[in-house]
């Protein structure tokens, strides 16, 4: 078995559980920081580990262009390349390709596009996109899909949905035929899988500590990250050696000793639900994608400019038609308040550039509301950014100092701001998981303040 998902508690539609991958287990609901080109901007991997990041998202389009799939494959896969031994998810590059607009041409076979780096011509088909994802070697990969713009006429949204369904079938067929080509396949298959201690156990330990102080894959043919707009609500890799970070009974070491089945011998591919902003198309897309029997399902094509309430409606339309026993991934969302709302609707996985992008523009998320750190009111503020936050930024630095760094265009401002925003998102999800397991999620949800009431 390559991928397994289990639900451990429910509260309403919200679920708490975990899934198992070749590079470790992930507790859900989970927020995945975006490391587009193999890095979360400004934050080294050891800091991400200290923050309790369980899984990262990398972008196939960007890594395909630079440094190239062949390079990453020869260096052992994306985990080994970026010195990160925890799980990674790659998107297929579809969203980035389709956002190029004037630089692309779509046919049934695939998409021709020009690189945003040098204008060179490239081609992605479902087969070549999956070949790239296999070559990169992430734990979870996405089927190749077509994203529609907003707004889109119904005929356009329906045609795109049909295309995505055909491409999903081709993506899965190619993956099934080539899944053993993942760079680390044989090492993981032949080695004990690292069943680590609970991510939340690791995070608790880390928080306490912080508080105290070879070939281009077949089918792949080759012929700017970071829009400052904040409107988003938006190969052989080393097998991970067995280690337990907890002496807690039932830890990974004990489960392995008891003979629990090893997981994660190759990648898992998720299908993507499309359908624009049409409820019936979203339902149809969900039902027909499920017929293809993926191990997990994503809801894509949202947070592209539509009103927030419309996003909620589209999620509500799709979720009931996705299998209860498989993870649900909502792509490209959202604010801290929104991700909690999506959990309430039954979503298990989310990613968004917002915490890192907003940090670089001086917008910080706190338990007291959003802080625009450049504001003059913070010039002599000796208090911490967030009195309730245990991240190393809030434990050490004042608002006045953070404002000084940002106003001086110091690189450290971006680093510290990003660390805090990620800590806030990750802590939010940790508290969500705890609330679901305690049967107190409704109470937790009622205490989440609306975004428009939380600006300082």
State each model region's role:
Residues 1-18, 26-30, 42, 145-151, ...:
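C-terminal extensions of enzymes
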Residues 1-188, 262, 376-379:
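Non-catalytic, usually N-terminal nucleic-acid engagement modules in DNA/RNA processing proteins
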Residues 24, 56, 91, 133, ...:
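Conserved, mostly hydrophobic/aromatic
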Residues 84, 89, 95-101, 107-118, ...:
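Active-site pocket-lining/capping segments in soluble small-molecule metabolic enzymes
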Residues 115, 265, 441:
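Long C-terminal interaction/binding lobes of large macromolecular proteins
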Residues 177-266:
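Intrinsic disorder/low-complexity segments
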Residues 178, 182, 264-385:
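Glycine-rich phosphate/ribose-binding loops and adjacent secondary-structure elements
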